[in-house]
């Protein structure tokens, strides 16, 4: 939810480099809706309609900040990352000004602790197909994601 603070971040930390991972909105909605988030401020995830509304607000805000701060925001397309991991990862590493290491292609080997609802996924290799998982539930969504197709 850091996207809500981009204006503050850019003002307080003018040298900050912001990374925006953009993903298929239906996949984002499904991933949020199917995951239990006990934290305050994430109650929208209990309703598919509220989740869709929240994702639309996120997209609108990111479009705004992308036009206002285009030189400070690097957009990384998740689906492109899964198709061409090396190319997209090198672009990201170059943007943030770090040296390239082959280990960047194996984030699943990093043993550092993580605190995320997707803690199991970060221990897997980057793979294709996760953005389509929602489709097997499409018959039960009553057209909720049609606006994304």
Task: Describe the residue ranges of each PLM region.
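Alpha-helical elements of the RecA-like P-loop NTPase motor core of helicases
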Residues: 4-7, 30, 90
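Conserved nucleotide-binding/hydrolysis micro-motifs of P-loop NTPases
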Residues: 2, 23-28, 81-83
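PAPS-dependent sulfotransferases, especially Golgi type II membrane carbohydrate sulfotransferases
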Residues: 12, 32-75, 83-149
């Amino acid at each position: 939810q850091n996207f809500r603070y981009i204006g503050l971040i850019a003002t307080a930390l003018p040298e900050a480099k912001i990374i925006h991972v953009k993903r298929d909105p239906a996949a984002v909605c499904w991933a949020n809706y199917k995951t239990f988030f006990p934290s305050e401020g994430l109650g929208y995830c209990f309703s598919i309609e509220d989740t869709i509304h929240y994702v639309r607000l996120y997209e609108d805000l990111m479009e705004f900040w992308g036009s206002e701060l285009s030189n400070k925001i690097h957009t990384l397309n998740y689906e492109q990352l899964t198709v061409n991991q090396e190319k997209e990862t090198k672009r990201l590493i170059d943007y943030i000004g770090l040296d390239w290491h082959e280990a960047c292609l194996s984030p699943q080997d990093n043993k550092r602790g993580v605190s995320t609802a997707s803690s199991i996924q970060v221990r897997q290799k980057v793979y294709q197909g996760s953005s389509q998982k929602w489709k097997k539930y499409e018959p039960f969504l009553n057209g909720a994601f049609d606006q994304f197709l």
